[in-house]
UniProtKB/Swiss-Prot annotation:
Gene Ontology BP term (one): long-chain fatty acid catabolic process
This protein's name: UPF0641 membrane protein PJ4664.05
Alphabetized Pfam families for the sequence: Far-17a_AIG1
UniProt keyword list: Endoplasmic reticulum, Membrane, Transmembrane, Transmembrane helix
Naturally occurring in which organism (per UniProt): Schizosaccharomyces pombe (strain 972 / ATCC 24843) (Fission yeast)
Length: 223
């Protein structure tokens, strides 16, 4: 059993190291190649749900990395809390981003953006965080513990908070970071946010259900 735990902790260390390095690179790319108008505006890049979720994912991976090194149960529990929030959130970011850009990329990325997004960056921020958090949750963490009611409240709260934040940024900047929001009326935007929160909640439920089937035998999750 101790051998299995040590191997699991080493594999977790590798995951968190790779993820941390990749996400730091992504933030560095954003800082050096970002849209100047967005960077100088109120809220900067944190107007984007992608960047907000990326920041929480990076934090969870850094905390996970330090927990792997130190063996601290406090850090493990903190990492799990962050992961429970961001794992379904990253999943919805990937679903929404790739489905929308496959239909019309200009709905999310302005046509006049000075620096086009290279594929490696696109994948690093819109796909790999989902991969990292799913692997971490399914193979190195205990299952989600919140019941249906509280978990639904959590994701509705996140959706409402982000909606209010985006509207605050619009009041200050007079433009939306995502072009799609400029063409949706208030009712359609409310529906959009509601659907997104329901999908996030659905991801939470599905991931909670499949977790027992993902963990390898003899490798107990760290809790």
């Amino acid at each position: 059993m101790s051998s299995a735990i040590s191997r699991s902790r080493f594999n977790s260390f590798i995951l968190h190291t790779v993820a941390t390095a990749n996400l730091i690179w992504a933030f560095n790319w954003i800082n050096h190649n970002s849209d100047v108008a967005i960077r100088r505006s109120y809220g900067s890049h944190f107007q984007h749900l992608t960047v907000l979720s990326l920041a929480v994912t990076l934090l969870s991976m850094v905390v996970g990395l330090f927990s792997d090194i130190s063996g601290s149960l406090t850090l493990v529990k903190l990492k799990n809390i962050l992961l429970y929030i961001v794992c379904p959130l990253e999943t919805i970011v990937s679903i929404l981003y790739w489905s929308i850009v496959s239909y019309d990329r200009s709905l999310l990325i302005p046509k006049d953006r000075p620096v086009p997004l290279p594929l490696n960056f696109d994948i690093s921020v819109h796909l790999m965080p989902t991969v990292y958090t799913l692997i971490d949750y399914l193979f190195f963490s205990p299952p989600f513990s919140l019941s249906i009611g509280p978990s639904l409240l959590v994701y509705l709260s996140i959706a409402v908070s982000y909606m209010l934040w985006v509207e605050k940024c619009y009041q200050m900047n007079k433009f939306y970071a995502y072009p799609i929001l400029a063409i949706l009326d208030p009712i359609k935007k409310t529906i959009f946010y509601t659907v997104a929160s329901i999908i996030s909640f659905s991801c939470y439920i599905v991931l909670k259900m499949v977790h027992p089937y993902a963990l390898p035998s003899g490798a107990p999750p760290r809790s």
